[in-house]
């Protein structure tokens, strides 16, 4: 049963040749002769001719073995789960979400040596303040929910090559899982709907996007809209049954890179307040020896994020974190800045203090 929606699903096991396969299917699909034929695409031999018999067979099997079939808790996203913990760090929790996100769900894991990752993180932190900021922002992503803060962007940009922007993004992603571009790190080459769904899937984990220039039109203008992700709420969309789909929501940090700023002279004040734009130049590289550093975090990743979350669940920690956040927010708000900018800066500083 999905602990977010309460929807029940069944795991079906079937054999193709000598190989057993498993698939998790919604009971809504298994109750409709029109929908159940979609399982043919997964390799199950169901057709429009035998659909009714197949549905009856599955129903009978479930009813006859109801007390023998184990019930598992499932989830289709990352992040905080009320009364349960933080996905995917909940024991016994299985993924039952969109099949397109299954591969990404599996990227959030530990691999290699925690000691080597810590050594690499300590080394890159000494290379530039920019690395400290984006690394801290990666941790800060999971603070937004308990602190009731809004999503915000940290964007590294620069026209010079070899500044280490992408490697810095990979270091930030390695806090949680496989930092390879195409694994946990995605690119701007996608649709608005796709980005909304990915943001909702990540939920409280950082959304890492590389290469802003991929989101430009034929005239070289950036088509990416900061507001689409910074609001933390997707569009309400209708469905075929005449109702509306569940409105996607998220509360995380969006970490990005590109050759140009994420905001410009034409951007509204609201967009500017939601983005921390950091220019990167080759004369002052964000990360030196990028090939070696990227290789190190590709081999060793996924340790720090879990430990950071586990610390937040310790008794009294959230209260202490909230008090420190309010203190930092007051200090920053007294300066020449807006509340949204102070909020983003306070969470980054706080995350850096907690992670060190």
Predicted regions and their residues:
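Conserved glycine-centered beta->alpha loop in an early N-terminal alpha/beta scaffold
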Residues: 1-126, 197-198, 202
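AAA+/SF3 P-loop NTPase mechanochemical coupling elements
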Residues: 200-202, 239-256, 271
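Conserved catalytic/switch belt of AAA+ P-loop NTPases
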Residues: 223-237
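Phosphate-sensing "switch" segment of ASCE/P-loop ATPases
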Residues: 248-250, 266-356
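P-loop NTPase catalytic core of nucleic-acid-dependent motor ATPases
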Residues: 93-181
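A short beta-strand-to-loop transition that corresponds to the Sensor-1 phosphate-sensing loop
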Residues: 211, 251-261, 279-282
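AAA+/P-loop NTPase substrate/partner-engagement loops
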Residues: 167-220
């Amino acid at each position: 049963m999905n602990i977010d929606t309460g929807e029940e699903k069944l795991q079906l096991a079937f054999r193709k040749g000598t190989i057993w396969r498993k698939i998790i299917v919604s009971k809504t699909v298994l109750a409709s002769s029109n929908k159940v034929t979609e399982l043919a695409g997964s390799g199950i031999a169901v057709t429009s001719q035998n659909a009714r018999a197949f549905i009856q067979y599955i129903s009978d099997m479930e009813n006859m073995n109801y007390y023998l079939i184990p019930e598992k808790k499932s989830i289709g996203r990352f992040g905080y789960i009320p009364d349960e913990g933080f996905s995917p760090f909940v024991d016994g929790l299985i993924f039952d979400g969109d099949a397109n996100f299954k591969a990404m769900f599996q990227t959030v894991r530990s691999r290699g040596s925690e000691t080597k990752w810590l050594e690499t993180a300590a080394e890159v932190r000494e290379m530039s303040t920019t690395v400290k900021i984006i690394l801290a922002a990666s941790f800060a992503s999971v603070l937004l929910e308990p602190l009731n803060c809004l999503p915000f962007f940290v964007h590294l940009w620069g026209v010079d090559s070899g500044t280490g922007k992408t490697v810095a993004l990979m270091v930030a992603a390695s806090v949680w899982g496989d930092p390879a571009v195409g694994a946990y790190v995605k690119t701007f080459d996608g649709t608005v709907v796709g980005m909304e769904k990915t943001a909702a899937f990540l939920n409280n984990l950082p959304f890492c996007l590389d290469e802003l220039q991929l989101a430009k039109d034929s005239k070289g203008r950036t088509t990416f809209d900061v507001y689409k992700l910074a609001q933390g709420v997707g569009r309400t969309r209708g469905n075929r049954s005449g109702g509306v789909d569940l409105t996607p929501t998220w509360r995380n940090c969006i970490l990005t890179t590109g050759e140009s700023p994420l905001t410009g002279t034409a951007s509204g004040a609201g967009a500017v307040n939601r983005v921390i734009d950091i220019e990167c130049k080759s004369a002052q590289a964000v990360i030196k020896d990028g090939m070696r550093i990227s290789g190190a975090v590709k081999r060793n990743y996924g340790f720090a994020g879990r430990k950071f979350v586990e610390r937040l669940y310790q008794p009294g920690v959230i209260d202490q974190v909230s008090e420190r956040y309010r203190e930092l927010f007051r200090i920053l708000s007294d300066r020449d800045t807006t509340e949204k900018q102070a909020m983003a800066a306070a969470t980054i500083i706080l995350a850096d203090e907690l992670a060190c």
